[in-house]
Swiss-Prot record:
Active-site feature positions: 13, 41
Bound cofactor: record note: Binds 1 Mg(2+) ion per subunit.
Enzyme class, spelled out: ligase
Entry keyword set: Cytoplasm, GTP-binding, Ligase, Magnesium, Metal-binding, Nucleotide-binding, Purine biosynthesis
Residues that coordinate or bind IMP: 13-16, 38-41, 127, 141, 222, 237, 301
UniProt record similarity statement: Belongs to the adenylosuccinate synthetase family.
Species lineage: Bacteria, Pseudomonadati, Elusimicrobiota, Endomicrobiia, Endomicrobiales
Subunit and interaction comment: Homodimer.
Location (main, coarse): cytoplasm
Protein name: Adenylosuccinate synthetase
UniProt catalytic activity: IMP + L-aspartate + GTP = N(6)-(1,2-dicarboxyethyl)-AMP + GDP + phosphate + 2 H(+)
Entry binding sites for Mg(2+): 13, 40
GO biological process, one term: 'de novo' AMP biosynthetic process
C-alpha cells in the first residue's frame, strides 16, 4: 500500500489537520486535491499552534514534499502570506512545495462577486474568499490557470475577457473596473515571480512517486456533507471532497488509490447555513460548542453543534469506500449523563435510514435518537483503549456498528501524542 486518502465525514472541522499531521510522518508526499483557502487546519507542532489554509499540513516536517494540485483554486496573495508565516517560524518550503500549473487562480473580482452574490441570493454561508466564483469560471471555461497567470500576454488577454463578462455585476455594485484592472495587473507583476519556482505538472510528479512506491497522503478540505454532488445541496462547497475527487482533482487513476480513511467527530458540527437535523439549540449545544472550542479556524464563526449523526457518517463511509475511521474529540463528550446518537430521520411518518436527497426532508425531518449512558472523568492522557471508561468504550463500539466501519484511532487533543491506537499496528500505507 502506498496511497492513502484522508477526508472528513461530516461538514468539515472534524480534526483532519491533526490527523494528517499525525500520519504525515509516515508519508513521503502530502497532496491537497480540492478546495481553496476557505478551509483551515489547526494543529500543534513542537508545542506551537499553526493554522494552515492552503498548504498541506505535512509542510511542518522538513523531509516531506507537499503538493497543491489542479483541483485546488489558489489565491496567490493568501498563499504568499501563509508562506511568510512559515518562514517566520523557520519552516522553509523551498524545493519541497509545488503547485499544479493547471490549478485555477482566485483574483480580486472573484472575492467581490462572492460577497455580492451572498448578499443578493439565498445565503449559502460562504467565507467570501472567492472560491465559488473561481470554480464557476472554471466550469464556464473562462478561468485563469496558474500557467496562464505566469504568461503575461496570455493573462492580460484573459483578464480583459473576464472583466468584460463581469462588468455588469461589478458596476452595479459600484466597483471601479479601471481601478480593479490596474490593481490586478500590478499585483501580478510581483505575485507571478513569487509563484513561478513552485509551479510544475503535479500529476506527473505523483505518477512518478507512485512508480517508486513512495507513500502518498491525499488531504481533503471541508467534508463529505459539503460535497458539491453528495452534500446538502445547495449549501455545499464548489468541489468534491469525497475520495472520488482525488482522481479528477489530482490527476490520479482510481486503481492507484489503495485506501481511504475518514475523520469523524464524536458529535456533529456545521458552520454557516443549511439543513442540520441534529442541531441542538439548548444548553447541551452550548456545552459542546464551548467544550470543543467550536469556532471556525478560517472565519472565527461559532459552529452549530449537535449529537452524533450516524445517518450522515454512514453516507460518507459508503460514498468514499472508507476502510478506517479516526474518531476525534471523544474527550468533549465526557461528563454527560446520557449521550444520544441519531440513527435515522423521520418525516411525515416515513423513516429514513439513508441520507435523503430531498431538500424538504433534509430541512424538516426530525432525528430519531438512540440513547446511551454517558461516561465520567477525564479521558485525556489515556493511551490504551481498554483504559477508557467502560461506557466510553461502548460508545465507540456502537458508533462502529452504526456506520459500518472500524474506528482505528481516537484523538483526545490537538497534540500528536494525544492519540489512542484502538487497533495496534495498523499499516496506513
Amino acid at each position: 500500500m502506498s496511497t492513502l486518502v484522508v477526508l472528513g465525514t461530516q461538514w468539515g472541522d472534524e480534526g483532519k489537520g491533526k490527523v494528517i499531521h499525525y500520519l504525515a510522518k509516515q508519508a513521503d508526499y502530502i497532496v491537497r486535491y480540492q478546495g481553496g483557502n476557505n478551509a483551515g487546519h489547526t494543529l500543534i507542532h513542537e508545542n506551537k499552534p499553526f493554522i494552515l489554509h492552503l498548504i498541506p499540513s505535512g509542510i511542518l516536517f522538513p523531509d516531506k514534499y507537499c503538493l497543491i494540485t489542479n483541483g485546488v483554486v489558489v489565491d496567490p496573495k493568501a498563499l504568499k502570506e501563509e508562506i511568510a508565516i512559515l518562514d517566520k517560524n523557520n519552516i522553509s518550503v523551498e524545493k519541497r512545495f509545488f503547485i499544479s500549473e493547471q490549478a485555477h487562480i482566485i483574483l480580486p473580482y472573484h472575492k467581490l462577486i462572492d460577497g455580492i452574490l451572498e448578499e443578493e441570493n439565498v445565503k449559502i454561508g460562504t467565507t467570501r474568499r472567492g472560491i465559488g466564483p473561481a470554480y464557476a469560471d472554471k466550469v464556464k471555461r473562462i478561468g485563469i490557470r496558474v500557467v496562464d497567470y505566469l504568461e503575461k500576454d496570455v493573462f492580460e488577454d484573459l483578464l480583459e475577457k473576464n472583466l468584460i463578462e463581469k462588468t455588469p455585476i461589478l458596476k452595479n455594485s459600484g466597483v471601479d473596473i479601471a481601478n480593479l484592472k490596474e490593481e490586478i495587473l500590478k499585483d501580478r507583476e510581483e505575485l507571478s515571480i513569487f509563484l513561478e519556482p513552485f509551479v510544475t505538472d503535479t500529476s506527473i510528479m505523483i505518477a512518478n512517486a507512485i512508480k517508486k512506491n513512495k507513500k502518498i497522503l491525499f488531504e481533503s478540505a471541508q467534508g463529505t456533507m459539503l460535497d458539491l454532488d453528495f452534500g446538502t445541496y445547495p449549501f455545499v462547497t464548489s468541489s468534491n471532497p469525497i475520495a472520488g475527487g482525488v482522481c479528477s482533482g489530482a490527476g490520479v487513476g482510481p486503481t492507484k488509490i489503495d485506501s481511504v480513511l475518514g475523520v469523524v467527530k464524536a458529535y456533529t458540527t456545521r458552520v454557516g447555513e443549511g439543513p442540520f437535523t441534529v442541531e441542538l439549540f439548548d444548553e447541551m449545544g452550548k456545552f459542546l460548542r464551548e467544550k470543543g472550542a467550536e469556532y471556525g479556524a478560517t472565519t472565527g464563526r461559532p459552529r452549530r453543534c449537535g449529537w452524533f449523526d450516524a445517518v450522515v457518517v454512514r453516507h460518507s463511509v459508503r460514498l468514499s469506500g472508507i476502510k478506517h475511521l479516526i474518531l476525534t474529540k471523544l474527550d468533549c463528550v465526557e461528563d454527560i449523563d446520557k449521550i444520544k446518537i441519531c440513527v435515522a430521520y423521520k418525516y411525515k411518518d416515513k423513516l429514513y435510514k439513508e441520507f435523503p436527497a430531498s431538500r424538504t426532508v433534509q430541512k424538516y425531518a426530525e432525528p430519531v435518537y438512540e440513547e446511551m449512558p454517558g461516561f465520567k472523568g477525564k479521558v485525556k492522557g489515556i493511551i490504551d483503549f481498554e483504559k477508557l471508561p467502560l461506557n466510553a468504550q461502548k460508545y465507540v463500539k456502537r458508533l462502529e456498528q452504526l456506520v459500518d466501519a472500524p474506528i482505528d484511532l481516537i484523538s483526545l487533543g490537538r497534540k500528536r501524542e494525544e492519540t489512542i491506537e484502538v487497533r495496534k499496528g495498523v499499516n496506513w500505507f
